Swiss-Prot record:
Chain's gene name: INP2
Glycan attachment points: 275, 343-344, 379, 517, 569, 574
Protein topology in the membrane: Single-pass membrane protein
InterPro entries, alphabetized: INP2
Misc remark: Present with 736 molecules/cell in log phase SD medium.
Example of a GO biological process term: peroxisome inheritance
Transmembrane segments: 215-231
Function: Required for peroxisome inheritance. Acts as the peroxisome-specific receptor for the myosin V motor MYO2.
GO molecular function: protein-membrane adaptor activity
Name of the protein: Inheritance of peroxisomes protein 2
Assembly mode: Interacts with MYO2.
Family: Belongs to the INP2 family.
Native source organism of the sequence: Saccharomyces cerevisiae (strain ATCC 204508 / S288c) (Baker's yeast)
Location relative to the cell: Peroxisome membrane
Amino acid sequence: MTTNSRPSALQAPGLQIFSMLKSSEEDGFMSSSLTLDSDNIIGVTENNRQEFYSTWRKPSLLSSRSVLHEYSPTIVGSNDCTFSPITVGKTTKFFNWDDIISRIFMQQPFGVTHQFFEEFRYSIITSHFLNDMNHYRLSLHLDQSIMNFHKSSTLLKNVPPKSVPFMATKYGKLAVAEDKKLYFRQNFNYLSMIITSYRVLTQLKKYCRKKNSPGLKRVVILILVAVYLSIQQEYFRRHLICYKTLLKVRKVLESLQQVDVMIHKYHLRFKEIKNHSFISRVSLISIADEHSSVIKELLVFSSDALFYKLKSIIPDIVIFSDTSELSKYCELYGIDVPNLYYNNTTTVKDLDGKLYRLKLLKKFMLCCLLSLDMTGNENLSNVNMRNALNKIFPDYMARVQLKKKYNPIGTFQNIVSLLRGLHSLLSTVLVSLNDHKQILYAFPEETSTNTGCERANVCSFSKNDKLFQALNYLKMIENNLLAIDIRNGITENDRNIIEDKLEELITFWKTSKICGNISRIQKVSPTNTINHGFHLDILKGRKSPRSSSVQGLSLERKVDFIDVAESVNDSFENDTELEEYEDYDCQEECSAGSRQNHRVDFIGKDSCRKPDFKQLSDNELRRKLDERILKLAQENREGRERLRTAKSFELLRKAQASMSVKFGFQKPLRDDAFLESRPLSKCKVSSEETIPFLYELKGLLGNDS
């Protein structure tokens, strides 16, 4: 190596790269070259270029710009280590091989993946969709973050626009394209270099006799240099891919949040215009209809485009997910697998259904990203979830079988390419929504009187309700049906499970009393709860035979009979009681004088039978007294109701007759207009409770005329 000439490209030190990659880059990471931005790379200006190259020969004279920092991609997770050219002093006769080898293998290329995946999961969990309440309070700030791969520093402004030869660095060969992008080409394959080095060292150990020969040291040093370069290039490549993956995920989450906010605003505006057109009558109603149609078209376009895009990329993401973890995340974030199946396989036409299925699919995509398989252990997969995914996505099992072996970096590369297409669609949808933003502020804001929630709860039953429990049984049957592996057919075990669930549901439905609960929740007549005037209904716990017959007879009910010795006086007493009740019913509508005579006769007859009642026991006397009081109270109440109803309908007929005279209706028209054209026996509204409705109908007919 000469000291009076500039070192060649092969002797250039490793560049310290801290770059923000452009999201519009089309080249993949597995292509022939790696792409970086040139705006944010620490470089060397003309003033310090000579110093930069001279420090390669004198490591102790390295400037502060060439020293690696804690955010360098080569030392993430290691603060006490800096990489510099390995030199051996001239006076050093023996040096420690263990120290050199430990420094070479200190950075494992695979260690960055686990650190990245924790930050990757944290970014998704704290997103707008999975943590709506506290996502702005849970930002992650780490000293050793994957995002520290890029740090703004001195710009490389003097990079030539074209560089024909590649410059060799420890991260690969560097070249500059016309669009100011930096391309890195990996020239040391990590696995092949490790295997080749291991074979060479094995052969040296087998055939080399002199362990301290200078030739052996030179060969070993060359092997260690090659291993070191392969480790650095693989580490840089993995760190770069993880950085771009996390960057793309954050951009997609931000775009999803912006699109979701705009869709929510348009949906609210659409509801306001629709409600305003029904509530108020304004002159701008034609403009409102026009704007509502535009908003509906925007919402349908946005929801359909995003839904079908997610539907196309989710099958490519879910094959990399661990089904057991995916099942846990779906349960945690309230994603119902049968509901996902119905929304993914059926056609939805209404706007609310389109927005709901889009929201459901977005959450499912994030759950798929959270459950990416980082262990490569497929033995712990959830069989039920796998069968359900095979029904939701018909080619799921075929894709899983064609998938390559466990390779997390390859998985992240595929995810970045899928998210890049989704991000471009989100940008297009967001531009379209922003172009029509003036519709959101076209009218003055109306104050909404409806303070209820936007969407009524579909199932308003409590957990203790029988119907709610029956729906839970049906949901369990749906989950069992989706968990059946259709490739092997329906086995006897699956059939028995479904039949047992159905039998449990049928048994539960038969034993429940849902119909009884519904029948009890009926409107009670005001005459049964509100009693005007004096009445004798003092024993509400007991019911008379006449009132019990109205509710229906129960032939299965047991009746207790009391054995009483019947005599001639008892039979005579029963006959006279029946005659008294019939006499009382006939004379209730007569004058007060006849009632007084009836009372006198009644008292007189009772006075004749006073000695007969002394022969009865206390219980028999109490029972007879209760029956008589209940009978009198029931007859009194029914008589008052009949009288009140007759008077009310008489007043109604008089009012109808006066209106017919006032408006001059002819006989046929009057027969069609009023209810007196039909007899009351044919009228469905013949109770006292329906009279207010008849008055309202009369008022409406009068207003329309």
